[in-house]
């Protein structure tokens, strides 16, 4: 049995089995076994169910010890298994427990039966769930203590059962061999110790108990598997985590050097006395500065205004001075004063949580120039790290999915093999008794046997019919009697009539129209609403419910109740009708309409929308497959909420005054479970810094920061993995899948209506013509074809008119298509169908002129194209690669040059006339001009100048008269130049060619814009025309190839996702309608005009009381700017919730809402948190996965069409990309030649040694450490020490520079790294010497530190730093060309929107998000605003300021100094369009940036796997070979082969143990067990590159090259191979073992034949013989 590779059947575990295991252990200790390839079976893991291929469980095998069916555990791990009645596998160690209980012990068997019983696990699960529920409750009654003691007893009993059944530590399946048991034992032991101790009331000890919630994970095998998978992903993320920590550390150190102490600068009211006060530090009187009231505060601000002493920093108002005093903002938690706070600030920037506040604080205190620092951190660091983590998780998920599919496939093959062997075993016996059995068997017995075989083969696959057959016969009679109605002929006729109605296409069309109208009626709900509209909507609701009821009745009549309820959509419709009727009866219950009925109406529309059904089907399958992961995420959120509540709940109650001056509890706390759950949910949504500040105020940094980091890191890992899994599922979305019957009927109905309209129009047109009937038919037929070309074949295949016109046009006999044939044509995706493309529609996928290309081809190619590719005949497009389109861009001049003559009919007629020759020469001249490269460069330069001048037209333009005049003349010059260019191209190419090119159309539009802007300047009433000049920046798109490529790729990847976007829009419409039903008119509140705060509900209850207040003068009953009063406002509010900007204020208004015209009350409707949580999950997360998945699918499709190349780079960049890839994949650079001078050679050896590089890296790290230990309030002694440390490091780096200059000479400056080091040394020396002469004010001490710190990038240097860093940076470097192209496009978008913002929002009142730093007054400030919006942060505050359009909020007549513009009001509609459109466009571009980098990361393993070996690889191979073959014999001994393979460098490297792999290579061996160099090289090369024709060609080239390099190769004849030699060795071992066993048995026989001596004397001879035989036996045993 031990030699069997696959134990078959279920064998009881007996004493013989235990003896075999012991013998096997003894043999393993004395022998060397080759079991390296033995691996555990995926389908036989502990916790999984036994495959059904093993048959049904025989009696006596349930809950009894069995021999393990997995050879890996049976042979290697010495285990036995137990199956419970649910076939779940349990494994135990086949060793004695506590030295007394063997596997055959009755006590242990009884305990094992208890452990494996399903009820025992159910008991533990119920206990854990009960305990988890009790943990989240507050103010528990006293009797709960008895329940907790009972649960503790159950946990203790469970531990005892596991210890007795499994043992404590012996074996891999012992109690302590499972880490989950460690957790369970620790928590239980701790709880037993502290149960009666007074320490149990402390929060820390209560927190430990919450770990019990995690016990749910080991109770579910799926959850346990997900945790193991996530741990494996975490191991793969270690390199990325190390790189992220490196970037965080470096950026924090730079932040310390740039901003240390700057955030303490505040505006202080300067005393007006004569200066008699005692001065403190030369900046002001000490007592005056320390007074908080003397700081300057903005209106409504909590912290003092920050300022700076630099030119572009924030300025103080008149009467105030900027002084460094006080604490840092945000209660001192936001600063760069030491490394810890700087690290927290950088982590906040990396996660993009409330970054706009940190931007403003730094820019106010240090200057706007430092925005560059934040751009680099946010755009590159945060973007790259997010892409890196997503890429690694995606790769891990794909590998796990591939592994699971392979193991499942292997398991299925094993199951089928087992079934086949089972059938073969029984086939012989059945053949012998065939005649007898056939006579005895009855049909029932035959069916039973077949059912058994089918069950054995299929296992868990049960057919529905089988389950229905198991029902009693009475149920079938009852169903046939009550649910299948065939009463009378009249009823049958009624049945047929109803069937004709519901199957008619117009019926489905009518239903779709009714559903759309119903949704429109729901969307018309708003506040306030007139009585007439309310009654109309109520009547409409009743009508639609009646229509749905009639539909259900007709379908029940037509299909019978039995057939009706067999379809899931019909069950859904019946639920909708029942709920609608219930709503009519219970009109007071509003929740039925909002939460149930409204979503069902929207889902009902999805039945007729194939994209919606396909997406929902994919979503359903994905969620079923990922149910364990979703459950794990839910458990983690629950655990984190309970953990936080237990840890910080008391602190939030006791220290509430630390957060609020009035000692009122804040909204976001963890005092109870609901608030803790919502707080954790907010943290996982990316907003954690504000709640962290409050937590640190009440509980301290030591507890809050670790807890928040745990929630952020683990929670984001789970969510990102779930996100990757869902995106991978939606990446398989195909819009061309089979459509439903309802959708087909809808298409047929629409086609029928179109055809009727066309026929009516056709008759009207034909009557007006006075021609014969035949001529009329001939003229009408083409139009009919054109009209029919817009429909699908399925829409018209049943119509006789279509067949008649088709017969007339083709002249052949046609056969009408039946309904079944038509539907089969539709359902088959492989059959050619007509694509519904409108007549004359332009090809949107290609912005170039494809029509010109087709016309320039010869006539034969045209005919082929007509016959082979027509959009009306096939859905398969002829793919034109991106490179061909780009080549066309370069060759378009030839096409225009060769084709312009053919496009002019007049020119063709009078070509030889004098005017014709002049016209032709003029066109040739114009063509040469516009195709000249200098002309193109000139136009490109003018385009850049024309675009760049837009940035100068800010609010200060009226004060700069010269620049204003210059711009006015410049606009005219640009207009003339572009008009001249347009005229030249008209003459050169002709109107048709010009307007057939979309880029030329864009140029023409820009010319129109320029002309309109010039006209708008001439008259004041046309001033709005002058503001559209920002559109002329769009001309940049047509002038630069990189932007063309990116825009073309974006269109190709985005347009196919329009249907998915519409589905997402419908989901948002659903939530908006629900929001209107829930919150319309409830966000109004009564505001105290004096304080600007809301009145308490005890002072004002409703609107009438608010208006009756005596001091009410300005109508304080105000509505929130963001509300749900109508669907449009609901969309905007949901958009802010989706971007997590301003969503807190929206949620606060919803949570405080009481009713219409009622004053809001603090947290009156806490259950409304549910609405926003559901929206974030189902309205944001899942639609986001859908969109990104479809975009990735389109990206991959376009990439495949282009042969696997990147679609965001040009043809020229693709060549550069290949060169860059070769350069980056090269493992080492060619070193400089070693100097011949001995001294220089010695120095060269020193500086090129790896130890020297390690020393330099350590010095850089030590220098970084000196910055970490600094802080803002350090003593002068520390500053002096830091100065001398900087001097020391400068000297050491200078010495390094001198040594390398001596060693490398002029070659030193050929490396960019060396040039950087040299510049750092020069500037560091200058930075140390300049303060001695000009003072430290101009050269800050941190400058030298930052210069020296810049050398830390050597850690990322290939070959110098960690290899894992180089591997992780490689995708970024390879995708850099594409990323730069996309960045150019997003910069152009930012530029256009910045100009638009300057024209529309430059004078908006400064409040909320618009201030002295973030505004639209200048181009730079506008770009800063748009940078914030690009990162989806801060745009809600800007929009809030733009919403000020009423007299109460702004002054429309305000005089703005220096300009003629009046007022500071905004335009809400323009602001909404501005921000929403920009966010969508920038999001789309940024998503493609993520996709580019992630796809590049995923492609690197395949590129490395498929790449050929380079010359460096072979050079290193022979370098290692020379160490093992110093005599150049071209041979090595076979015993050295393993060491040689382990000494090679990757990719030829083979780690030990590698003997099995080397033997499998079957290498030829010569006499003396030697192996030739060429054989080893060819075998290793084949292992790396695989086996195909390309590899065989490369191997032949390697062999021929080796023969040329070694012409005197020693000839030899291989006598054997490594595989044969191993087989011989194994055979010899077996023979030797058998001989030794024979010798041992003979020796035992001789010993037994020696007679015993009865007397007490001993014969010395016999004693010697006996002892010699014993020694001989012992020696034989030793040899064995």
UniProtKB/Swiss-Prot annotation:
Intramembrane segments: 339-366, 673-699, 1127-1153, 1420-1443
Record's compositionally biased regions (Polar residues): 807-833
Membrane-protein topology: Multi-pass membrane protein
Localization annotation: Cell membrane
Modified residues (Phosphoserine): 842
Keywords: Cell membrane, Disulfide bond, Glycoprotein, Membrane, Phosphoprotein, Repeat, Transmembrane, Transmembrane helix
I repeats: 100-401
Residue spans crossing the bilayer: 118-137, 142-167, 179-196, 201-219, 238-259, 368-407, 506-521, 531-559, 569-586, 593-608, 626-654, 701-731, 934-952, 961-989, 998-1019, 1021-1039, 1055-1079, 1167-1201, 1250-1271, 1276-1304, 1312-1337, 1341-1361, 1377-1401, 1468-1503
Biological processes annotated in GO: cellular homeostasis; osmosensory signaling pathway; response to bacterium; sodium ion homeostasis; sodium ion transport
II repeats: 487-756
Catalytic activity: Na(+)(in) = Na(+)(out)
Region span, Disordered: 807-874, 1646-1680
InterPro entries assigned to the protein according to its UniProt record, in alphabetical order: Ion_trans_dom, Na_channel_asu, Na_chnl_inactivation_gate, Na_trans_assoc_dom, VGCC_Ca_Na, Volt_channel_dom_sf
Pfam families named among the record's database cross-references: Ion_trans, IQ_SCN5A_C, Na_trans_assoc
Disulphide-bridged cysteine pairs: 267-307, 657-663, 695-704, 1086-1106, 1450-1465
A Gene Ontology molecular function term of the record: voltage-gated sodium channel activity
CDD domains, per the entry: Na_channel_gate
SUPFAM superfamilies cross-referenced by the UniProt entry: Voltage-gated potassium channels
Cytoplasmic topological domain: 1-117, 168-178, 220-237, 408-505, 560-568, 609-625, 732-933, 990-997, 1040-1054, 1202-1249, 1305-1311, 1362-1376, 1504-1680
GO cellular component: glial cell projection; plasma membrane
Entry text on domains: The sequence contains 4 internal repeats, each with 5 hydrophobic segments (S1, S2, S3, S5, S6) and one positively charged segment (S4). Segments S4 are probably the voltage-sensors and are characterized by a series of positively charged amino acids at every third position.
Subunit structure: The sodium channel formed by SCN7A is probably a heterooligomeric complex consisting of the ion conducting pore forming alpha subunit SCN7A and regulatory beta subunits such as SCN3B. Interacts with ATP1A1; activates ATP1A1 and thereby indirectly signals to nearby neurons to regulate sodium homeostasis.
PANTHER family from the UniProt entry: SODIUM CHANNEL PROTEIN (PTHR10037:SF14), VOLTAGE-GATED CATION CHANNEL CALCIUM AND SODIUM (PTHR10037)
Entry's family note: Belongs to the sodium channel (TC 1.A.1.10) family. SCN7A subfamily.
Entry protein name: Sodium channel protein type 7 subunit alpha
Organism (species): Rattus norvegicus
The gene coding this protein: Scn7a
């Amino acid at each position: 049995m031990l030699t069997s590779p696959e134990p078959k059947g279920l064998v009881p575990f007996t004493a013989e089995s235990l003896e075999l295991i012991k013998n096997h252990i003894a043999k393993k200790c004395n022998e060397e076994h080759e079991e390296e390839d033995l691996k555990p079976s995926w389908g036989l893991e502990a916790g999984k169910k036994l495959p059904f291929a093993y048959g049904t469980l025989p009696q006596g095998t349930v809950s009894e010890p069995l021999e393990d069916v997995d050879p890996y555990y049976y042979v290697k791990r010495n285990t036995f298994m137990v199956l419970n009645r649910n076939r779940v596998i349990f494994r135990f160690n086949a060793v004695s427990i506590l030295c007394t209980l063997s596997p055959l012990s009755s006590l242990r068997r009884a305990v094992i039966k208890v452990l494996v019983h399903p009820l025992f696990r159910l008991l533990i699960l119920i206990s854990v769930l009960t305990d988890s529920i009790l943990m989240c409750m507050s103010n528990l009654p006293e009797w709960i203590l008895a329940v907790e003691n009972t649960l503790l007893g159950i946990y203790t009993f469970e531990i005892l059962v596991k210890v007795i059944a499994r043992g404590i530590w012996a074996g891999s399946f012992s109690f302590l061999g499972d880490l989950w048991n460690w957790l369970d034992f620790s928590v239980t032991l701790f709880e037993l110790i502290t149960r009666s101790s007074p320490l149990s009331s402390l929060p820390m000890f209560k927190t430990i108990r919450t770990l019990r919630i995690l016990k749910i994970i080991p109770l579910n095998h799926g959850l346990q598997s997900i945790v193991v998978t996530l741990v494996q992903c975490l191991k793969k993320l270690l390199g990325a985590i190390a790189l992220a920590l490196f970037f965080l550390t470096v950026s924090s150190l730079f932040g310390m050097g740039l901003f240390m102490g700057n955030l303490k600068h505040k505006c202080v009211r300067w005393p007006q006395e004569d200066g008699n006060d005692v001065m403190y530090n030369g900046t002001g009187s000490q007592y005056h500065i320390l007074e908080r009231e003397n700081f300057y505060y903005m209106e409504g601000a909590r912290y003092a205004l920050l300022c700076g002493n630099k030119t572009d920093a924030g300025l103080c108002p008149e009467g105030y001075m900027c002084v460094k005093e006080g604490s840092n903002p945000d209660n001192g938690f936001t600063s760069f004063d030491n490394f810890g706070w700087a690290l927290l600030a950088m982590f906040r920037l990396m996660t993009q949580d409330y970054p706009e506040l940190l931007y403003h604080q730094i820019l106010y205190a240090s200057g706007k120039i430092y925005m560059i620092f934040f751009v680099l951190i946010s755009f590159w660091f945060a973007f790259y790290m997010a892409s890196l983590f997503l890429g690694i998780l995606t790769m891990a998920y794909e590998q796990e999915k591939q592994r699971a599919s392979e193991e499942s496939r292997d398991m299925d093959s094993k199951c089928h093999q087992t079934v086949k062997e089972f059938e073969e075993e029984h086939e012989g016996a059945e053949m012998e008794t065939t005649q007898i059995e056939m006579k005895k068997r009855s049909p029932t017995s035959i069916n039973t046997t077949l059912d058994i075989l089918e069950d054995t083969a299929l296992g868990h696959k049960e057919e529905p019919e089988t389950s229905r057959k198991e029902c009693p016969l009475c149920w079938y009679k009852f169903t046939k009697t009550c649910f299948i109605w065939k009463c009378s002929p009249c009823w049958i006729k009624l049945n047929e009539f109803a069937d004709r109605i519901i199957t008619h296409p117009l019926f489905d069309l009518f239903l779709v129209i009714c559903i759309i109208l119903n949704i429109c009626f729901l969307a018309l709900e708003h506040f306030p609403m007139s009585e007439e509209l309310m009654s109309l909507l109520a009547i409409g609701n009743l009508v639609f419910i009646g229509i749905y009821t009639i539909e259900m009745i007709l379908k029940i009549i037509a299909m019978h109740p039995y057939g009706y309820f067999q379809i899931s959509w019909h069950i859904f419709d019946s639920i909708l009708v029942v709920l609608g009727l219930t709503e009519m009866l219970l009109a007071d219950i509003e929740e039925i309409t909002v939460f149930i009925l409204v979503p069902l109406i929207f889902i009902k529309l999805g039945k007729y929308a194939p994209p919606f059904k396909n997406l929902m089907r994919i979503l359903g399958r994905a969620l079923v497959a990922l149910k364990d992961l979703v459950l794990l995420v839910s458990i983690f959120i629950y655990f984190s909420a309970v953990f936080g509540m237990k840890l910080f709940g008391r602190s939030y109650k006791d220290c509430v005054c630390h957060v609020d001056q009035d000692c009122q509890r804040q909204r976001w706390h963890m005092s109870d479970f609901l608030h803790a759950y919502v707080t954790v949910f907010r943290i996982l949504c990316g907003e954690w810094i504000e709640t962290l500040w409050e937590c640190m105020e009440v509980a301290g940094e030591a507890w809050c920061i670790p807890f928040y980091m745990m929630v952020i890191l683990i929670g984001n890992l789970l969510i990102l993995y779930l996100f990757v899994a869902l995106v991978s599922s939606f990446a398989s979305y195909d819009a061309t899948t089979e459509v439903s019957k309802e959708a087909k009927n809808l298409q047929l109905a629409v086609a029928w209506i179109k055809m009727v309209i066309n026929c009516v129009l056709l008759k009207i047109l034909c009557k007006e013509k006075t021609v014969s009937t035949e001529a009329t038919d001939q003229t009408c037929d083409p139009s009919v074809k054109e009209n029919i070309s817009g429909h699908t074949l399925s829409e018209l295949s049943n119509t006789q008119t279509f067949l008649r016109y088709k017969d007339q046009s083709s002249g052949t006999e046609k056969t009408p298509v039946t309904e079944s044939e038509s539907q089969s044509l539709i359902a088959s995706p492989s059959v050619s169908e007509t694509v519904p493309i409108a007549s004359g529609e332009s090809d949107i996928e290609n912005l170039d002129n494809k029509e010109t290309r087709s016309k320039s081809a010869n006539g034969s190619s045209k005919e082929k194209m007509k016959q082979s590719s027509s959009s009306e005949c096939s859905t398969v497009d002829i793919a034109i690669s991106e490179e061909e389109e780009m080549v066309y861009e370069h060759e378009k001049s030839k096409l225009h040059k060769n084709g312009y003559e053919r496009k002019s009919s007049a020119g063709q007629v009078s070509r030889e006339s004098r005017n014709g020759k002049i016209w032709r020469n003029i066109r040739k001249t114009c063509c040469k001009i516009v195709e000249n490269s200098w002309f193109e460069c000139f136009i490109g330069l003018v385009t850049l100048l024309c675009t760049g001048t837009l940035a100068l037209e800010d609010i200060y333009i009226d004060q700069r008269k010269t620049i204003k005049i210059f711009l006015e003349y410049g606009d005219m010059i640009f207009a003339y130049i572009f008009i001249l260019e347009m005229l030249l191209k008209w003459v050169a190419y002709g109107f048709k060619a010009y307007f057939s090119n979309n880029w030329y159309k864009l140029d023409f539009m820009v010319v129109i814009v320029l002309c309109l802007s010039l006209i708008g300047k001439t008259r004041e009433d046309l001033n709005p025309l002058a503001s559209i000049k920002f559109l002329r920046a769009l001309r940049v798109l047509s002038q630069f190839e990189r932007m063309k490529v990116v825009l073309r790729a974006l269109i190709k990847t985005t347009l196919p996702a329009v249907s998915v976007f519409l589905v997402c829009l419908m989901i948002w419409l659903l939530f908006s309608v629900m929001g209107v039903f829930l919150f319309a008119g409830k966000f109004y509140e009564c505001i105290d005009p004096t304080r600007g705060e809301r009145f308490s509900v005890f002072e004002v209850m409703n609107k009438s009381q608010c208006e009756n207040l005596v001091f009410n003068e300005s109508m304080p009953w105000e509505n929130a700017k963001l509300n749900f009063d109508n669907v449009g406002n609901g969309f905007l509010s949901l958009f802010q919730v989706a971007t997590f900007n301003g969503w807190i204020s929206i949620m606060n208004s919803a949570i405080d809402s009481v009713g219409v015209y009622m004053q809001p009350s603090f947290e009156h409707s806490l259950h409304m948190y549910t609405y926003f949580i559901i929206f974030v999950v189902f309205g944001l997360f899942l639609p986001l996965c859908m969109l990104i998945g479809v975009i990735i699918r389109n990206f991959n499709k376009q990439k495949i069409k282009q042969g696997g190349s990147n679609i965001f780079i040009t043809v020229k960049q693709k060549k550069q990309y290949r060169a860059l890839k070769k350069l980056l994949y090269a493992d080492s650079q060619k070193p400089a030649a070693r100097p011949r001078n001995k001294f220089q050679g010695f120095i060269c050896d020193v500086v090129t040694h790896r130890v020297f590089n390690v020393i330099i890296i350590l010095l850089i790290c030590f220098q970084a450490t000196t910055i970490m230990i600094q802080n803002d309030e350090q003593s002068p002694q520390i500053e002096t020490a830091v100065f001398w440390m900087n001097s020391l490091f400068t000297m050491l780096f200078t010495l390094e520079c001198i040594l390398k200059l001596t060693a490398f000479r002029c070659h030193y400056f050929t490396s960019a790294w060396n040039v950087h080091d040299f510049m750092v040394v020069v500037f560091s020396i200058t930075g140390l010497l300049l303060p001695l002469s000009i003072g430290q004010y101009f050269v800050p001490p941190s400058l030298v530190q930052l210069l020296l710190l810049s050398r830390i990038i050597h850690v990322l240097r290939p070959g110098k730093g960690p290899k894992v860093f180089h591997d992780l940076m490689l995708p970024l470097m390879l995708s850099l060309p594409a990323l730069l192209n996309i960045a150019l496009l997003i910069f152009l978008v930012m530029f256009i929107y910045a100009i638009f913002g300057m024209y529309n929002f430059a004078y908006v009142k400064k409040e909320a998000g618009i201030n002295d730093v973030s505004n639209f007054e200048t181009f730079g400030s506008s770009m800063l605003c748009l940078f914030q919006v690009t990162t989806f942060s801060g745009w809600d505050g800007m929009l809030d300021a733009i919403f000020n359009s009423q007299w109460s909020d702004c002054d429309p007549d305000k005089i703005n100094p220096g300009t003629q513009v009046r007022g500071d009001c905004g335009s809400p509609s323009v602001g909404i369009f501005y921000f929403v459109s920009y966010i969508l466009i920038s999001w789309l571009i940024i998503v493609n940036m993520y996709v580019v980098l992630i796809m590049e990361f995923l492609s690197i393993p395949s590129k490395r796997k498929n790449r050929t070996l380079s010359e460096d690889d072979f050079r290193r191979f022979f370098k290692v070979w020379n160490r093992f073959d110093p005599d150049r014999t071209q041979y090595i001994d076979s015993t050295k082969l393993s060491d040689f393979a382990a000494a090679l460098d990757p990719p030829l490297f083979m780690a030990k143990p590698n003997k099995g792999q080397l033997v499998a290579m079957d290498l030829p061996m010569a006499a003396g067990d030697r192996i030739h160099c060429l054989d080893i090289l060819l075998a290793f090369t084949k292992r790396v590159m695989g086996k195909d024709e390309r590899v065989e060609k490369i191997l032949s080239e390697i062999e021929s090259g080796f023969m040329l390099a070694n012409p005197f190769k020693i000839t030899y004849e291989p006598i054997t191979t490594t595989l044969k030699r191993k087989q011989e060795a194994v055979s010899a071992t077996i023979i030797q073992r058998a001989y030794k066993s024979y010798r041992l048995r003979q020796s035992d026989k001789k010993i037994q034949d020696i007679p015993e001596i009865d007397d007490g004397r001993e014969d010395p001879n016999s004693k010697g013989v006996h002892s010699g035989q014993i020694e001989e036996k012992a020696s034989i045993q030793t040899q064995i």
